[in-house]
Amino acid sequence: SPLNSERWYILPWDLDGSFKEAEHILHSRSDYAEWERGVSNYWGNVLFQRCLQTELYRNALAEAVDALYAKLTDGRLEAYAETYSALLKPYVYSGPDKKHVPLTSAQYDYVASSLVEEVKNNYAVYKQSYEKPMPFYIGVPEAKEQTVSVQWDTAYTFDAETVTYSFELADEYTFSNPIVKKTGLRIPTTEFQLPEAGQYFVRVIATDAGGETQTAFDC
């Protein structure tokens, strides 16, 4: 950011990952945890977290998002995609690049035509994310004789709703057959019998009074 300026310019390093939803659908791929969509994606940053907890800054963010959304859905994005596609496709689908293109020509057209719809979906996710609990961190499990205790941070909600938690322990990451499963926990801690030596996975999900859910950062 420039010196002697009251405005900060924050540029994400992963802009190359933007507008990938349609491509991921075509490849049956998902790179995102539940919390990585909407404002919860920034909750792990202390500065952003404090800003999001302040109504003044949330309103300022909403104004900026709404302004950007209006620009991206006024027809210009379709025009840009059409213009760039006409310029780039002849080169992309000719040698040697053609050997490394992850999409067919028809799939390329589908992705290009889906950009505005992705913007609309992302805007809806942004709005909805305020209705969900924010993600949280799970502490390091502690073994005590024949039991193990696990604690985690409280899940924040913007409406100060009551939150309950479910806890699962499994020996495989899909949690298809959990060894331990507890639901309706009202405090962010639980205990269970010490399992046999091995590799285990923990999952904690927060649920607010309205039924909205959120996973921990660590899940």
Predicted segments, located by residue:
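Middle-to-C-terminal accessory/interaction subdomains
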Residues: 4-157, 162
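Asp-box/BNR beta-propeller loop motif
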Residues: 16, 172-178, 197, 209-211
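Solvent-exposed loop/turn segments flanking beta-strands in beta-repeat/beta-sandwich domains
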Residues: 155-178
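Short beta-strand segments within Ig-like beta-sandwich modules, predominantly Fibronectin type-III
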Residues: 180-186
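Surface-exposed, short loops/turns at beta-strand junctions within beta-sandwich domains
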Residues: 192-199
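Extracellular fibronectin type III
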Residues: 209-219
